[in-house]
Amino acid sequence: MINKFLTIFLIFSIVIIKVLSQSSNEQPLNVVPYPQEVTMIGCNIPLSVGSISIKSNIESTILSISISRYQSLFFPFVSNNVLKDSSSNIELSLIIASDDETLELGIDESYFLLVNQDTYQIKANTIYGAMRGLETFKQMVVYDVVENSYSLTCAEVVDYPTYQWRGLLVDNARHFLPKNMVLHIIDSMGYNKFNTMHWHLIDTVAFPVESKTYPKLTEALLGPGAIITHDDILEVVAYAKTYGIRVIPEFDVPGHSASWGVGYPELLSNCPGYPQSSIPLDCSNPYTYSFLENFFSEIAPLFQDSYFHTGGDELVIDCWANDTSIQKWMKTNNYNTSDAFQYFEDQLDVILKSINRTKIAWNDVLQHGVKFDKETTLVQTWTNINDLRDVLAAGYKTITSFFFYLDRQSPTGNHYHYEWQDTWEDFYASDPRLNITSNAENILGGEATMFGEQVSTVNWDARVWPRAIGISERLWSATEINNITLALPRIGQFSCDMSRRGISSGPLFPDFCSLPDDLSFSFKPVYQLSKDEIKLILKKK
């Protein structure tokens, strides 16, 4: 009995020591997001360029692409000082329980990773768990800039995400992002173990999505050629899947709808005196719903995921009260504007059910008195923590965004930072379930949002990274992994690693980030001065 008690006590003590060491005292493994459990083994294995091979026990097209990708990322600097002998060649073994490539919310992303002098192994239940393990393994391959050499850190890792929904909103409407830029964004998301891309495809200013059913929708373009074709969507969805990233489309209705009306003005309400940007879809017109049904039926099959975001935020609802035909319709049905909004959302539910999709809507729809089916609707909360509590109290499942607005210079309520880059600390400290005492289990996760009023291809990376690295860790790692001082050097190093992979992620503190030649020397002046020209120019003051 005493021996049994001592055994239990020792196991309990070891667990406590492990948790405390990771949360309070040290984070010895230089990995982002930080894993759930880490045991350092105390060795570093020297490597030479090209010395890592990967072997899997299953066949999977998606996994093969992921393996090829990481094979190309292990050694960004092609020359090093490590001898190319057989002793530094290692074979990483992937042992995966299932070859099922189905990707959906709640997919198992856990993995076990072991690196020591004799074993190089990742075990996972799914190919997507193996992918997460490959990213961790990649970060354990360390480049020493002084010695110009590589080594592999020995450790045992048990890892899984804290939140099942770890998203990033990509705005393709306010500034057009061409397909290759979207693929580049997916690369950066995959490196950070994000698993959901919320694709905000249209807005008031533009409708850049091709429709073969309603071709005049793309009369509302930002510029010539600024259009996302069906083939583009299919490629984006497929490419994202090779990172274990689900793609959720958002078509925001009934507000933010001016772009719908450029090609099809009969869809819009008639509200004299209201700016065009404030005019919503006509909730009283049966044509509105047949149009949406036909359009959504065309678009939904391009996306594999069961979730479909219908927006609903920032509706200028008084417009409906000032449209004479809508007034007449509301009077006939004994509706007020809240009833009209409820009717609109109910019709959306019928449409989404017919195409086998689950609704996501912004939380301010609820603030108009609208009620959703709690079993078939996911609410995205973007306003504040009190509204989050209201959403939870009403029994809805939710994902949170108000913590993670990347388009703002500082998160809401925090104005003490002098450097906007330092707002990563606010994001890092913002656990979605923090200060939530009721129904916290209904918070599925969170989304960083990069609305694009002032963001385009030229500055997207710099506005998102490295700040979103902190968000990725907050959504993946254990709640106890929250020490900003310990996180800073890891995130700084990983930001450099992302730069070496072609993502323009900047520094968080003064440091030196060596880049491969193809990245370091990619900047060239429009006119290259010769040595003689330099001397001639400097000859006179």
UniProtKB/Swiss-Prot annotation:
Main location: other
Keywords: Glycoprotein, Glycosidase, Hydrolase, Lysosome, Signal
Glycosylated residues, chain numbering: N322, N336, N356, N435, N483
Subcellular location: Lysosome
One Gene Ontology cellular component: lysosome
Active site: E314
GO biological process: carbohydrate metabolic process; glycosaminoglycan metabolic process; N-glycan processing
GO terms of molecular function: beta-N-acetylhexosaminidase activity
Ranges that cross the membrane: none
Endpoints of the signal sequence: 1-21
Enzyme Commission number(s) of this protein: 3.2.1.52
Known catalytic reactions: Hydrolysis of terminal non-reducing N-acetyl-D-hexosamine residues in N-acetyl-beta-D-hexosaminides
Gene3D superfamilies: Chitobiase/beta-hexosaminidase domain 2-like, Glycosidases
Keyword flag Amino-acid biosynthesis: no
UniProt record similarity statement: Belongs to the glycosyl hydrolase 20 family.
Protein task: Responsible for the degradation of GM2 gangliosides, and a variety of other molecules containing terminal N-acetyl hexosamines.
Protein name per Swiss-Prot or TrEMBL: Beta-hexosaminidase subunit A2
